[in-house]
Every structure is written in structure tokens, then in C-alpha cells.
């Protein structure tokens, strides 16, 4: 189920802030001390920003297309779209880059709209594999191109700052649809264009 544009209206701002105070007390802090008095409000406002993707439908960004493209039917690639997301298992940050390619089928979309699709899915609780598939499916369903390729690189704080504590590790996922999946040459051209492997820790 897509929870786009849905909010839990039964949970108030005050209740969300009280939940933060509970976590502060659980951690051993005093939420009434001066340095923490505004923390619950700030955390709730930050969450409103970090998870604003639940209030959007990414498909909406791809509704306006352009068909006057003078017969252009070759690969279109947008690479190094930076994103910030949060792991749904530990609520820890995921920071990385998204690379998108598609073969138009008579229409194209403004490149900023592809970046907005990425933002909309990233600003939710995610696992990288799911986000990769969601972005590819959104583009395929809305633009109906001959093929779509999505590659995501991500550094996961749930691995670098807790548990195994392995810094410098990045995860790479891909989703290929249509010609990108069926034709090795198209897939290779896309992967050559995006040059996967730039250190996401430099972001």
C-alpha cells in the first residue's frame, strides 16, 4: 500500500513531542533541563521534513511531459542525484546517490522531476532495495519508456555507527526494466555513463 499524501491525523504535535520526552527520559536524560526544553519540538519538526515523502505521490511529478523532442530516442541519464533517507529498521540515516536512465518512447520529462521522484521516496522510512524498485516502477508506470535503469549507492549509518561499526562501506543496488534488462548493450552503456564507484562517503 502506498501511504502517499496520508498522515495519521489522530496523532497530534503535542503527542509526538511527548514521545520524544519519553525517549529522552529512557536514555537517562531530564527533558526539563534548559538544553533539552525545545528538543521535542525541534525533533518533531525535523521528522516532518525528513519524512515529508509520505505526503506526496511521486507519480504526480511525472505527469507533465514533452513530446516535441525532434525524434530523440537515445539514452537519457541523470546521475549523481544526492539523497538522504532513513533506515526503517533502526531509523538511522542513509546517505548516497541515485543514477537514473531511461529510453524515451516518444516523450520525455523535465530532469528536475526525476530528482523530485527520488526525494519523495527517500523522505520515508526505507530499505535501499525497496527504494530502488519504487523509483524504477514509478518512472516505468508513468512515462512508459522502452526501458528504465536505476542504480543507488548508499552509506548506511545503521552499519557505520552501531552494530558492526564498519565505516567506509557503501551498498549498491540496481533495478533494470524493459530494454535495460533485456539488452546487455543498453545496460552496459548506462553503467558506463554513470561510472558507479565514486565514494559516497565524500558527500
Curated annotation (Swiss-Prot):
Pathway: Cofactor biosynthesis; 7,8-dihydroneopterin triphosphate biosynthesis; 7,8-dihydroneopterin triphosphate from GTP: step 1/1
Binding of Zn(2+), residues: 87, 90, 158
Source superkingdom: Bacteria
InterPro entries, sorted: GTP-CH-I_C/QueF, GTP-CH-I_N, GTP_CycHdrlase_I, GTP_CycHdrlase_I_CS, GTP_CycHdrlase_I_dom
Gene Ontology terms: cellular component: cytoplasm
Catalytic activity field: GTP + H2O = 7,8-dihydroneopterin 3'-triphosphate + formate + H(+)
Keyword Metal-binding among UniProt keywords: yes
Entry's EC annotation: 3.5.4.16
Keyword flag Zinc: yes
GO MF annotation terms: GTP binding; GTP cyclohydrolase I activity; zinc ion binding
GO biological process assignments: one-carbon metabolic process; tetrahydrobiopterin biosynthetic process; tetrahydrofolate biosynthetic process
Keywords: GTP-binding, Hydrolase, Metal-binding, Nucleotide-binding, One-carbon metabolism, Zinc
Family indicated by similarity: Belongs to the GTP cyclohydrolase I family.
Record note on quaternary structure: Toroid-shaped homodecamer, composed of two pentamers of five dimers.
Protein name: GTP cyclohydrolase 1
Gene name, Swiss-Prot/TrEMBL: folE
Amino acid at each position: 500500500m502506498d501511504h502517499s499524501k496520508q498522515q495519521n491525523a489522530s496523532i497530534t504535535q503535542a503527542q509526538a513531542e511527548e514521545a520524544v520526552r519519553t525517549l529522552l527520559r529512557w536514555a537517562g536524560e531530564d527533558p526539563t533541563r534548559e538544553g533539552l526544553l525545545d528538543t521535542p519540538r525541534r525533533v518533531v519538526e525535523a521528522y516532518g521534513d525528513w519524512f515529508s515523502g509520505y505526503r506526496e505521490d511521486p507519480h504526480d511529478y511525472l505527469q507533465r511531459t514533452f513530446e516535441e523532442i525532434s525524434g530523440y530516442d537515445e539514452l537519457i541519464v541523470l546521475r549523481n542525484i544526492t539523497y538522504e533517507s532513513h533506515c526503517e529498521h533502526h531509523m538511522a540515516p542513509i546517505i548516497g546517490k541515485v543514477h537514473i536512465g531511461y529510453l524515451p518512447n516518444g516523450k520525455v520529462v523535465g530532469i528536475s522531476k526525476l530528482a523530485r521522484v527520488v526525494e519523495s521516496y527517500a523522505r520515508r522510512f526505507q530499505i535501499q532495495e525497496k527504494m530502488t524498485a519504487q523509483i524504477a516502477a514509478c518512472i516505468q508506470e508513468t512515462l512508459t519508456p522502452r526501458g528504465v535503469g536505476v542504480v543507488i549507492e548508499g552509506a548506511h549509518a545503521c552499519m557505520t555507527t552501531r552494530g558492526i561499526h564498519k565505516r567506509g562501506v557503501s551498498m549498491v543496488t540496481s533495478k533494470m526494466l524493459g530494454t535495460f534488462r533485456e539488452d546487455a548493450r543498453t545496460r552496459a552503456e548506462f553503467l558506463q555513463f554513470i561510472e558507479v564507484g565514486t565514494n559516497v562517503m565524500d558527500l
